[in-house]
Amino acid sequence: MSTSLSYRDAGVDIDAGDQLVENIKPFAKRTMRPEVLGDLGGFGALVEIGKKYKNPVLVSGTDGVGTKLKLAFDWDKHDTVGIDLVAMSVNDILVQGAEPLFFLDYFACGKLDVPRATDVIKGIAQGCEESGCALIGGETAEMPGMYPVGEYDLAGFAVGVVEKENVITGRSIGAGDVVLGLASNGAHSNGYSLIRKIIERDNPDLDAEFDNGKTLREAVIAPTRLYVKPILAALEKFTIKGMAHITGGGITENVPRVLPENTVAQIDAKSWELPKLFQWLQKAGNVETQEMYRTFNCGIGMVVIVAAEDADAVQGLLGEQGETVYRLGLIRERQGDEHQTQVA
């Protein structure tokens, strides 16, 4: 008679999955909002839309962390990629004026390493807590043979809400409006295939002091900045005409996504100093300037477009909220079919 087999023999450890759930419950609990009904563990999570909304619109977004995860594996650094995961989605839905309500994650691996997965999901919970977003559930998929040992993949899903009359569309943007830029916290979660290629070719000392007490390793792996609370504070007092989360495609490919077809964002390249990380990437990789602008955020993580008469006040308020804000340039009329973001 053949030996009796179990799911664990096939590579799936149900007990490990149960232990992970117990590990993360206290962190998820800290993220809860009044709109969430019930606790973790149900087949579905219940969230009600508060009565403060007259005509609510739900705004959804999903994203991952990309090949930044490869550095997390190589450097055994797993406690901040969860923050990246949350930021990539909540910053996206923020662009349309939405307040993030809840977040779900998908964690997939070949063999579940409970301490490592706990670090990742603690980071997710931290990102949710910092953005006022409830971590209401997720999926942990242990799939033997699907991923190399020690590796995993992440995906995140955020849903927010905004009054229909307050949805930010960018349609009111016009010539003379001011383009503000909020400083990034590094490369965030984009351009890492090129970053990894540059590191591989240049072979730098990753642990030497690099910038303001940080090593190059720390500068490269720094988590994506969350802009939720400062932007929501600005929206309470001012009209923001348009925003762009500077992700894949960099400054020149993301800003046009919110501009009317007859407008151009004219950005002054001297209005902010290229952070040291990007200076190093450009030099070590011999990367052309325009390639930098369409690959990396180059130090600008979120672009905010406002009327000229509001620019000083919005810049001041965001500064009070802890943001470093640059006046990048102006909106002008488009000439022919020129590219809608000009950096010069």
From Swiss-Prot:
Q: One GO term of the cellular component aspect?
A: cytosol
Q: What is its EC number?
A: 6.3.3.1
Q: Which Gene3D superfamilies match?
A: PurM-like C-terminal domain, PurM-like, N-terminal domain
The record's Gene Ontology biological-process terms are: 'de novo' IMP biosynthetic process; adenine biosynthetic process
Q: What is this protein called?
A: Phosphoribosylformylglycinamidine cyclo-ligase
- Pathway it works in: Purine metabolism; IMP biosynthesis via de novo pathway; 5-amino-1-(5-phospho-D-ribosyl)imidazole from N(2)-formyl-N(1)-(5-phospho-D-ribosyl)glycinamide: step 2/2
Family designation: Belongs to the AIR synthase family.
Molecular-function annotations in GO: ATP binding; phosphoribosylamine-glycine ligase activity; phosphoribosylformylglycinamidine cyclo-ligase activity
Q: Which top EC class is named for this enzyme in its record?
A: ligase
Give the record's keywords alphabetically.
Answer: ATP-binding, Cytoplasm, Ligase, Nucleotide-binding, Purine biosynthesis
Instruction: Look up the domain of life of the source.
Output: Bacteria
The record's listing under CDD domains reads:
PurM
Q: Which organism is it from?
A: Neisseria meningitidis serogroup C (strain 053442)
Reactions performed catalytically = 2-formamido-N(1)-(5-O-phospho-beta-D-ribosyl)acetamidine + ATP = 5-amino-1-(5-phospho-beta-D-ribosyl)imidazole + ADP + phosphate + H(+)
Q: Which InterPro entries match?
A: PurM-like_C_dom, PurM-like_C_sf, PurM-like_N, PurM-like_N_sf, PurM_cligase
**Cell compartments where the protein resides:** Cytoplasm
Q: Supply the Pfam families for this chain.
A: AIRS, AIRS_C
Q: Where is the signal peptide?
A: none
